[in-house]
Amino acid sequence: MQVYGCCELVRELYAQIGSGDQAYIPQAISCAVKALNDVAADESLPKEVREKAAFAAANLLISDFEDK
């Protein structure tokens, strides 16, 4: 997936990180899994949203890519 296929908020933050206005996180996979886990655990959100986040987090965890 490329940035242009993402929502406006993601594109805005991408531009801010690229320009140095927002912090870059070297351990991006760990950051993504934590954020997805937070969404999956938030019982105030619709179940469908939580399940999508949990599925994405589980796939990242089972992948062979590791942050170093």
UniProtKB/Swiss-Prot annotation:
InterPro entries registered for this protein in UniProt: UPF0253
Organism: Vibrio parahaemolyticus serotype O3:K6 (strain RIMD 2210633)
Family statement: Belongs to the UPF0253 family.
Pfam families (alphabetical): UPF0253 (PF06786)
UniProt name for this protein: UPF0253 protein VP2335
NCBIfam families named among the record's database cross-references: PRK04964.1
Protein origin, superkingdom: Bacteria
